[in-house]
From Swiss-Prot:
GO terms for molecular function: formyl-CoA transferase activity. Involved in the catabolism of oxalate and in the adapatation to low pH via the induction of the oxalate-dependent acid tolerance response (ATR). Catalyzes the transfer of the CoA moiety from formyl-CoA to oxalate. InterPro entries: CoA-transferase_III_domain (IPR050483), CoA-Trfase_fam_III (IPR003673), CoA-Trfase_III_dom3_sf (IPR044855), CoA-Trfase_III_dom_1_sf (IPR023606), Formyl_CoA_transfer (IPR017659). Substrate binds at G248, G249, Q250. Belongs to the CoA-transferase III family. Frc subfamily. CoA binds at residues 17-18, 38, 72-75, 96-98, 104, 137-140, 273-275. The keyword Iron does not apply. Homodimer. The active site is at D169. It is an enzyme of class 2 (transferase). This is Formyl-CoA:oxalate CoA-transferase. Its EC number is 2.8.3.16.
Amino acid sequence: MSTPLQGIKVLDFTGVQSGPSCTQMLAWFGADVIKIERPGFGDVTRHQLRDIPDIDALYFTMLNSNKRSIELNTKTAEGKEVMEKLIREADILVENFHPGAIDHMGFTWEHIQEINPRLIFGSIKGFDECSPYVNVKAYENVAQAAGGAASTTGFWDGPPLVSAAALGDSNTGMHLLIGLLAALLHREKTGRGQRVTMSMQDAVLNLCRVKLRDQQRLDKLGYLEEYPQYPNGTFGDAVPRGGNAGGGGQPGWILKCKGWETDPNAYIYFTIQEQNWENTCKAIGKPEWITDPAYSTAHARQPHIFDIFAEIEKYTVTIDKHEAVAYLTQFDIPCAPVLSMKEISLDPSLRQSGSVVEVEQPLRGKYLTVGCPMKFSAFTPDIKAAPLLGEHTAAVLQELGYSDDEIAAMKQNHAI
């Protein structure tokens, strides 16, 4: 089966989550991704949050499928030589080290260009070079805090909150992926590679653009009418936290369903659409609200929007969340059950679509991983297990022209 990136070679000089999520997607698209790891230890996530002693952790296996792994010590002369040979043959190199780390290894962007002018160099950092935080070590929640997500997440009477979704890590990897694919297309026109940099702060901010929209509206108006604070609360000079309110001008809220007392996920998300208000009233048994001036328009409803949701909840609390969604969908009401990760892991439709995939790795055995989120009509990514540490070292070195004796000598010299 032909794949989009067949014939593209990627050097994966990344660790933890932001970089590996990007390179894993490149591998799913058919690129030959060679993960370069520290001899004897590898990516730190091989060891973090283990569920089986002395076996690669799920943290690693779920972010590194379809890759090849080599152990390489770039601090040695032989290791540097191997690295230069790899760069000479590669199309893309991706790194997410702390600022300056790869330069200290001797692989500055300028030197990489000298070795291979066609190479595309993808780099993830916490912040842009012009940022006052450029030297701050950035992880998931650091990026969420600096990118605008934390200040606008949570309830108005509580502290900022970070999202459980990987807005700082995997989201940054997906943004870099887009940049790398664009750079590949650009290389077809120019014949030259380029550097693609992606800051975690920028990736989070790109998902918070509606909040930047709201900031500008707040600066001009002094209020935001779709937020729960309007019209009875107060607004400061920055976009407030809105709890579970919808952010697109359509009121929404989390509502209890049957069993909420013992099931922490017995809830649905319910959205009120202006154009669907009549159907909403019929669905919840309040047909009189259709023509009542206190309810008939979005502007009229906002002052008592929580009373409206409380009334809707009187119905949803009597039935199972799945029954509630099935019923409300008949009235074209945007809604969804709050699904736990347990439910998602067992969902047959997600298995059927390839969104959740079972793979098998030597030593670990079978495990679940997230599959490719994009569905293509011309090809289906074949999701494979993550590599064992150094599993492909010999094969990759042989491809570079090294003999068995030379490989053995490099191992003796701790270069691999």
